[in-house]
Design a protein with these regions (language model features):
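Short, charged interaction patches at domain edges and termini
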Residues: 1-12, 52-58, 109-156
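A short, highly charged nucleic-acid-interacting micro-segment common to nuclease
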Residues: 1-8, 89-97
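Short, well-structured alpha-helical interface segments that form or flank functional binding sites
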Residues: 5, 37-40, 58, 95-98, ...
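Short glycine-rich beta-strand segments
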Residues: 62-71, 145-147
C-alpha cells in the first residue's frame, strides 16, 4: 500500500456519511483558510513520519478535527450552571471525538481487508482557542503499518 492509497482511504473515510466532515484538507494547516465559515467541521491531514523497517513502513498521520465554537453574550457569572460556560465547546469536543472514533473504526476495517495494520492505541488530544477564529477540536495521530513493497518485490 502506498502513501497515496493511505491518504485516499483517510479522505474517503472522513467524507463518509457516518463521519461527515464538510471539508477535508491535506498538508500544512497554515495553507487552509480557517476564516471561511462554510468549511466546518473540517478534518485536516498532516503527514508526520514514515519509518522504514526491514519489511514494513510505518506512516504516522496527524488528523485534526476542527469546528467553530459559538459564544453567547451572557456573562459567565450570570449563568445558572457555569460549568457549561457561555459557549458550546463541550458540544464541539463531544461531537468531534465521536466522529474521530467512528472514522478510526472504519479505517481499521478498511485496512484489515488489505492486511494492513493500524496501531491499536490511539491518543486524541483536545485543543481550544488554538486558532484565532474560535476553533476547538481534537488532534490524533494514526500510525499505519504497511508491507515495504520495494523490499518484498526484491527491488532493493
Amino acid at each position: 500500500m502506498t502513501y497515496y492509497q493511505i491518504t485516499e482511504i483517510l479522505h474517503d473515510t472522513l467524507t463518509d456519511s457516518r463521519v461527515d466532515f464538510t471539508t477535508i484538507t491535506h498538508g500544512s494547516i497554515e495553507d487552509v483558510d480557517l476564516a471561511r465559515q462554510t468549511i466546518f467541521p473540517l478534518a485536516h491531514i498532516t503527514p508526520s513520519t514514515a519509518t522504514l523497517a526491514d519489511k514494513t513502513i510505518s506512516f504516522s498521520m496527524n488528523v485534526a478535527a476542527l469546528d467553530i465554537v459559538d459564544y453567547n453574550k451572557n456573562n459567565l457569572r450570570d449563568e445558572t450552571n457555569p460549568f457549561y460556560g457561555t459557549d458550546n465547546k463541550i458540544d464541539v469536543l463531544s461531537d468531534l471525538i465521536t466522529r474521530l472514533q467512528i472514522a478510526v473504526d472504519i479505517i481499521r476495517r478498511k485496512l484489515a481487508d488489505r492486511n494492513v495494520a493500524i496501531e491499536t492505541s490511539i491518543t486524541n488530544t483536545p485543543f481550544v482557542d488554538r486558532f484565532e477564529n474560535l476553533l476547538a477540536g481534537w488532534e490524533t495521530t494514526l500510525t499505519i503499518i504497511v508491507p515495504n513493497s520495494a523490499v518484498n518485490q526484491g527491488a532493493c
